Amino acid sequence: MLAILLLQAAVPAVPTDWSALAPLPYLTAPQMAPPLARFVAGEIAAGRCSLPRPADGHYVVKVDVATLVGADGSVLRAVPHAIACPTVEQYSVGLVLKFARANLPPRAGAADQWFRATIVYDWGG
C-alpha cells in the first residue's frame, strides 16, 4: 500500500489548464493520413458520438491529449480531453502513443513533463 502511495506522489497530476501545455516535441511531425479519419467518421455515422453534422458536411474533429513524457523521451501517461465520444478519445490516445514511439527527444536530467498533442480528423461527410 505504501508503495502505491509513493508512486502516486511521484507522478505529476494532470494539469487543469491544457492550453498552457507546450506542444508534444516530435522529432518528426506525424502525418495524419486520410484513412485515419475513417474510424472517426464511422463512429459518428453509427451514432456512437454526439457530434453535430456540419451544414456543409465537412467535419473537423480535434482531440487534445495531455501527454506525460519522461526524461528518456518515453510516454508515461496519456489522457484524452473529453469530446463526448469515448471510442474516438481512446483511438486518439493510441495514435499519440504510436506517433511518439521513438520519436521524442530525450531530455537528460529533466523531470517528467506534461505536453499537449492535438489530433485533427478532417474529412468531407
Q: Positions of the model-derived regions?
A:
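Charge-biased low-complexity segments
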Residues: 2-125
